[in-house]
A protein has these predicted regions:
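N-terminal secretory signal peptides that target proteins for export/translocation
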Residues: 1-22
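Bacterial N-terminal signal peptides
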Residues: 21-37
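Primarily a LysM-type cell-wall glycan-binding module
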Residues: 42-71
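Loop/turn positions that initiate beta-strands
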Residues: 60, 92-95, 242-245
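Solvent-exposed, polar/charged alpha-helical surfaces in well-ordered, non-transmembrane soluble domains
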Residues: 64-68, 75, 79, 222, ...
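Cell wall/extracellular polymer interaction/catalysis modules
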Residues: 73-75, 90-162, 270, 285-326
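Short acidic beta-strand-loop surface patches of small beta-rich interaction domains
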Residues: 78-86
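Exported/periplasmic cell-wall-interacting domains
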Residues: 170-326
Length: 326
């Protein structure tokens, strides 16, 4: 795998890896697939970016605390660690940090947001067919009845210290819940937009910060894209008005690295449910679309297992060409 990603191993991560290695055979197996990256330079001969890591629970941690420390969202941490109590995890417990990703299947520069994954990918000026620079961030998206719109749009305006003008629909919702809002929420700690906001060409929708960072990585917004304060600050500084934004619905992603085919599966949106058979058919369609001109061999049981787990972690399912399947 080529050098690529936004995460460098932290001291805590390295300590946790050593502790976990000493404690369990599982940790040894996980270390076999860890890929360390530095900077954000990438070569698209690999469709995978980032690094898979182990951490451990310190006394008083919640899973949300660990997620925030490692630039993760809540849901992706829950999917990767389903057996761990998110609010009262036992101190010393191993925690998988699922920060290894298959790139979305897109051909565009700019910002790409994958709704089921609740993750943003920011590509440089060229497409994934060439060398590019890329960053990735967890995001919150619209809940079921307030879904985030899909499709192509652009950044139309950037606002620092924005005031929030809640639309009538949100004013009515809060009033019905006994939590009335003012017609204008001024900039400051009570403003849910945070310190930075970028307006989208889809009227009424924004990419913005938050005053409730522990909600990042959940379907909790009224359709806007919400980011950790430190991430929106960086994105705001490096994004121009007119930047392209593409919002997609890709619960299943496939990619290749060093001749090995990987599958990354996330739960489908509740408004677009799919059973195992339909998800399997979609996986085969994606494989034919990406590798149709090449020979490839699959471990079909591995495909089915990944689709059942839906844990968001790239899983080896086969090989390209005449490589030996393992």
């Amino acid at each position: 795998m080529q050098s690529c990603g936004t995460y460098a191993p932290t001291t805590r991560a390295l300590v946790s890896l050593l502790r976990s290695f000493a404690r369990s055979f599982f940790a040894f197996l996980l270390l076999l697939v860890i890929v360390f990256h530095s900077s954000v330079a990438a070569n698209t001969k690999s469709d995978l970016v980032g690094e898979l890591m182990l951490a451990f629970v310190e006394q008083g941690d919640t899973l949300s605390d660990i997620a925030r420390s490692y630039n993760q969202g809540y849901t992706e941490m829950r999917l990767a660690n389903p057996a761990i109590d998110p609010w009262l995890p036992q101190a010393g417990t191993d925690v998988i940090i699922p920060s290894l990703y298959i790139l979305p299947s897109v051909k565009t520069a700019g910002i790409v947001i994958n709704i089921p994954e609740m993750r943003m990918y920011v590509f440089g000026t060229s497409t994934r067919e060439n060398s590019f620079e890329m960053s990735t961030y967890p995001v919150s998206v619209g809940r079921q009845k307030w879904g985030t719109p899909h499709g192509a749009m652009t950044i139309t305006m950037k606002l620092e210290d924005p005031a929030w003008y809640p639309p009538d629909s949100i004013l009515a919702e809060h009033a019905a819940n006994g939590d009335p809002l003012p017609k204008v929420v001024v900039a400051g700690p009570k403003n849910p937009l945070g310190k930075f906001a970028m307006l989208l060409s889809e009227k009424g929708y924004l990419i913005h910060g938050t005053n409730k960072p522990y909600g990042i990585g959940m379907r909790v917004t009224h359709g806007c894209i919400r980011m950790y304060p430190k991430h929106i600050k960086k994105l705001f500084a490096n994004t121009k008005s007119g930047t392209k934004v593409l919002i997609v619905n890709q619960p299943i992603k496939v990619g290749v690295d060093a001749g090995i085919i990987y599958l990354e599966a996330h739960p489908s949106l509740k408004e677009n449910p799919g059973d195992l058979a339909s998800r399997y058919a979609e996986t085969m369609r994606l494989l034919d679309l990406q590798f149709g001109s090449d020979k490839f061999k699959l471990r079909y049981l591995a495909v089915q297992k990944a689709l059942r787990l839906e844990n968001g972690i790239p899983t080896s399912i086969g090989v390209i060409g005449d490589n030996v399947i393992r």
